[in-house]
Amino acid sequence: MAKEKFNRTKVHMNVGTIGHVDHGKTTLSAAITTYCAKKYGDKLLKYDEIDNAPEEKERGITINTRHLEYQSDKRHYAHIDCPGHADYVKNMITGAAQMDGAILVVSAPDSVMPQTKEHLLLARQVGVPSIIVFLNKVDLVDDPELVELVEEEVRETLTSYGFPEDTPIIKGSAFKALQEGATAEDTACIEELLKTMDEYFKDPVRDSDKPFLLPIEDIFTIQGRGTVVTGRIERGVIKMNEEVEIVGIKPTKKTVVTGIEMFNKLLDEGEAGDNVGLLLRGIEKKEVERGQVLAKPGSIHPHTKFEAQIYVLSKEEGGRHSPFFSGYRPQFYFRTTDITGTVNLPEGTDMVKPGDNTKIIGELIHPIAMDQGLKLAIREGGRTIASGQVTNIIE
């Protein structure tokens, strides 16, 4: 059979399952892919293929994740499922797999459990835009009133973490929907879930539609032409003769892009994902350095003080062997550069041990271009000891 061409007509979206251990996340993931394989002819992955997820390394942190894909009437979904709780925590904090929407799986016989809450808190902190709840194993609860009570508890929990009270809740049994002889009644919950995902999750803003930003990696002088900076465009589009700002480390400076090159060819414009060289008007080589960014004027500002949520690598992952305390001074790695800074721990936290996840307040010796959601690594002697993202900007 000839290979099928990737269909770009449907909107692409990243989703994932979250929730307490053994509440049925992987079973639900398998039920969705099975349903879609039958309906749309997608490739099928069986439950055990999803559950023994391969290890991935994201900046030296080992994370087990399984990437699935399926399509609905409206979208093409890339879906991540993590087998272990620690994998979820690492995945969400390090932003290894960004989610445009999450499916929170709650077992009806067990209701809300500690990891249900922890995953919701993380989803809120790392900016997962919206959540749909799948209330699983409802066939194991005889009393419909009990199911209603669980639903109420789920809604209260959602609002306590800042998600809307009218978040959709789909009830069903992933296990029943997954069975060989599943009836239309058994799979109705999966059909309803997909329809709700299509309607309730909003289309993600594509990187190319966001304001232009390029982290500077290298700087060259071209005799008779001026200064060229190189890097990969993180977001947005840059056109010839557009004004940009050089942000971070030094005072912000305006300039104009007078040339765009990729693979030694001249372009009229560069877009998110392109590795480009940009010629800057009236800028000397010594005025620019690695670690600064080029950005659309006014779209990003330099900051030194921020809150972040981080995961601290365990000793086995190559992290520290001992805890650290408030006042710890490591290197913070943002985009393309290391900058020295101080880590302060929140009130009530005396120290942070390898393997922990925690909130910190970071303060840098130089300002860098920063916005909420920016990924960071904390390094010591050239090795990564923690990883996470900026959750709030202080100054």
From Swiss-Prot:
GO MF term list: GTP binding; GTPase activity; translation elongation factor activity
A GO CC annotation given for this chain: cytoplasm
Localization per Swiss-Prot or TrEMBL: Cytoplasm
Pfam family, any one: GTP_EFTU_D2
Domain tr-type G residues, every copy: 10-205
PROSITE patterns from the UniProt entry: G_TR_1, G_TR_2
Residue segments, region G2: 60-64
Chain segments carrying region G5: 173-175
Catalytic activity as recorded in UniProt: GTP + H2O = GDP + phosphate + H(+)
Region span, G4: 136-139
Primary location group: cytoplasm
Region (G1): 19-26
EC number: 3.6.5.3
Region G3, residue ranges: 81-84
Keywords: Cytoplasm, Elongation factor, GTP-binding, Hydrolase, Magnesium, Metal-binding, Nucleotide-binding, Protein biosynthesis
Domain of life: Bacteria
UniProt cross-references to NCBIfam families, sorted A to Z: EF-Tu, PRK00049.1, PRK12735.1, PRK12736.1, small_GTP
Function field: GTP hydrolase that promotes the GTP-dependent binding of aminoacyl-tRNA to the A-site of ribosomes during protein biosynthesis.
Family the entry assigns: Belongs to the TRAFAC class translation factor GTPase superfamily. Classic translation factor GTPase family. EF-Tu/EF-1A subfamily.
Subunit structure: Monomer.
Protein name: Elongation factor Tu
Source organism per UniProt: Treponema denticola (strain ATCC 35405 / DSM 14222 / CIP 103919 / JCM 8153 / KCTC 15104)
Gene behind this protein: tuf
